[in-house]
């Protein structure tokens, strides 16, 4: 059933004798487009041929017209919604969409729980009560968790996340984002029992494998939901807020460990795990009450449900029925367009046609986050200790580091809208490269002096803060914006799995051995290795990462379909509907008119 029929309207079907009825409507829309061109300072010389102007393929527009009722009404309403969203002021977005902000932040709080849990596991290798319980004595007399077990536990978490991500792809397709998250919250409540009651590293490892499965579901669903419930002006705030949720969880974890650092009995490490039971029930209740993503509803042809979700996400005083109709039209139009230009909605389709380029971008940008040097920051407490800083001071530094990370993410919100995604990421990578070099030079003397150890520790704090000002939060925005809406969840899953796979290979195996005194014992010199990987991915970002700031999803579809080079994404003028040069307009008119006429013949 077409959307006009859903609203009780009679679709205007075009028969063979009615071409003159649709021609004026198309020409009227083209006139609107020409007027918009003149306002933007565009002329016919800026057509798609010279790379400054991208538009929908006329054949694609024609096929969309075949699949929907009352095509011209759909086009006009979608055009209104596209311009409204693209030109919306931030203050207006905050005024109209406070509910969308609230629901998105609520579901993203799953990541606070995950950040707390993963940080606890990462910090336990340097936490005295845990080391004394499960560790073996190192040559220097201290108890250490063997590198093989460090790798195994961290690797089990990543493997669990990979499994969970795949489960998320299947469940979200059938149940939607909300029920997939709720099922993971129920599961993780039971999985916490494993590490809490563990009396050996084997049971602890199994527990982290199972917890990782639930965490993998959260990683995808929260980002996808945030990207689909808010308009363009709010998109980077709510998607990058996911990174802040990680930091909040890590900050709470660091504070708990500082408070328990002097406790030597088994409750010194059991209390942090027991605190994980605080999160699931209230988050599950809130998730149950939240509206489903309207984009998910449109993709599954639940259009009435999608409209209800739209209205629940916006304040009624600023979101009229006309606004809802226009927003629905844009979602339906975008979905129909993606059906025509994409191969399908299976995982394999992420590697076909223009979606291959999009998959490359989301995977590599998440790999860049890992390979930028943040591995050292992620093992900060352990790194500080091996650099010569006391246990107590190392945990305090880690706590302060997480506080600065939060400040960095919040500060990025004020820059991101002006600087753009690519600029902020690129300069962040360059600054991190310099900080890594300084850190490495502090480890040339073995052992480093007190001043060198503290300098290296300071550089790691600045490194982590820089990451969380740039690539840390921005990567969540990029991976949610780049994929097509029909493949968003699967693309994020593939990207996060690439991230987890590289973590297993480099972070869980290489980084632990680099720092562990019983293994390679590089100390601060490990930063030289990460400086090398940083510069490789900095080059990729410069040449391959496009700028997506201020683009609607329909506009991004057109840019990728037109194969616009990454360096021209920001400057290319895009029209998602009927627009372009005079010849292109005529071609669109002819195709759509003939197809509409053919429907009734």
Q: Could you describe each region identified by the protein language model?
A:
Residues 324-337:
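Cytosol/matrix-facing amphipathic helices and coiled-coil assembly/linker segments
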């Amino acid at each position: 059933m077409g959307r006009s029929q859903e609203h009780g309207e009679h679709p205007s079907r075009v028969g063979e004798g009615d071409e003159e009825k649709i021609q004026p409507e198309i020409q009227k829309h083209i006139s609107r487009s020409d007027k918009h061109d003149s306002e933007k300072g565009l002329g016919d010389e800026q057509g798609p041929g010279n790379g400054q102007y991208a538009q929908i393929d006329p054949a694609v527009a024609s096929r969309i017209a075949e699949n929907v009722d009352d095509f011209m009404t759909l086009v006009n309403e979608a055009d209104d919604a596209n311009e409204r969203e693209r030109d919306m002021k931030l203050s207006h977005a905050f005024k109209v969409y406070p509910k969308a902000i609230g629901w998105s932040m609520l579901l993203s709080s799953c990541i606070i729980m995950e950040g707390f849990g993963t940080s606890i596991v990462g910090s336990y290798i340097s936490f005295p009560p845990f080391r004394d319980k499960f560790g073996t004595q190192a040559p220097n007399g201290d108890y250490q968790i063997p590198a093989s077990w460090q790798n195994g536990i961290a690797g089990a978490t990543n493997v669990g996340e990979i499994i969970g991500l795949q489960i998320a792809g299947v469940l979200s397709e059938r149940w939607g984002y909300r029920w997939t998250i709720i099922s993971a919250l129920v599961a993780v409540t039971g999985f916490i029992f494993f590490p809490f009651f563990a009396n050996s590293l084997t049971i602890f490892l199994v527990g982290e494998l199972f917890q990782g499965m639930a965490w993998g579901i959260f990683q995808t669903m929260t980002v996808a939901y945030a990207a689909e419930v808010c308009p363009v002006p709010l998109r980077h705030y709510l998607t990058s807020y996911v990174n802040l949720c990680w930091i909040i969880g890590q900050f709470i974890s660091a504070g708990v460990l500082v408070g328990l650092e002097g406790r030597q009995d088994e409750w010194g490490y059991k209390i942090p795990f027991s605190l994980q039971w605080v999160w699931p029930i209230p988050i599950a209740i809130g998730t149950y009450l939240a509206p489903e993503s309207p984009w998910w509803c449109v993709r599954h042809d639940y259009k009435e449900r999608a409209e209800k979700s739209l209205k629940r996400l916006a304040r009624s005083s600023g979101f009229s029925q006309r606004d809802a109709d226009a927003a629905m039209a844009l979602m339906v139009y975008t979905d129909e367009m993606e059906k025509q230009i994409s191969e399908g909605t299976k995982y394999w389709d992420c590697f076909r046609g223009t979606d291959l380029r999009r998959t490359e971008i989301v995977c590599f940008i998440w790999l860049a986050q890992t390979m930028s040097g943040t591995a050292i920051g992620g093992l900060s407490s352990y790194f500080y200790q091996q650099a010569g800083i006391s246990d107590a001071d190392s945990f305090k530094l880690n706590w302060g580091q997480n506080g600065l990370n939060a400040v960095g993410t919040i500060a990025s919100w004020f820059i991101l809208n002006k600087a753009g995604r690519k600029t902020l990421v690129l300069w962040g990578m360059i600054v991190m490269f310099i900080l890594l070099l300084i850190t490495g030079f502090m480890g040339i003397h073995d052992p480093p002096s007190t001043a060198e150890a503290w300098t290296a520790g300071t550089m790691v704090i600045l490194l982590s803060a820089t990451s969380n000002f740039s690539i840390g939060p921005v990567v969540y925005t990029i991976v949610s914006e780049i994929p097509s809406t029909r493949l968003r969840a699967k693309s994020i899953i593939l990207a996060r799995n690439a991230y987890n796979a590289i973590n297993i290979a480099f972070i869980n195996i290489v980084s632990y051995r680099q720092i562990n005194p019983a293994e390679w014992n590089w100390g601060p010199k490990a930063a030289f290795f990460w400086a090398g990987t940083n510069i490789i991915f900095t080059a990729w970002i410069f040449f391959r990462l496009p700028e997506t700031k201020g683009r609607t999803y329909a506009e991004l579809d057109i840019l990728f379909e037109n194969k616009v080079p990454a360096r021209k994404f920001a400057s290319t003028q895009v029209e998602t509907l009927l627009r372009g040069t005079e010849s292109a307009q005529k071609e669109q008119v002819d195709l759509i008119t003939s197809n509409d006429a053919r429907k009734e013949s």
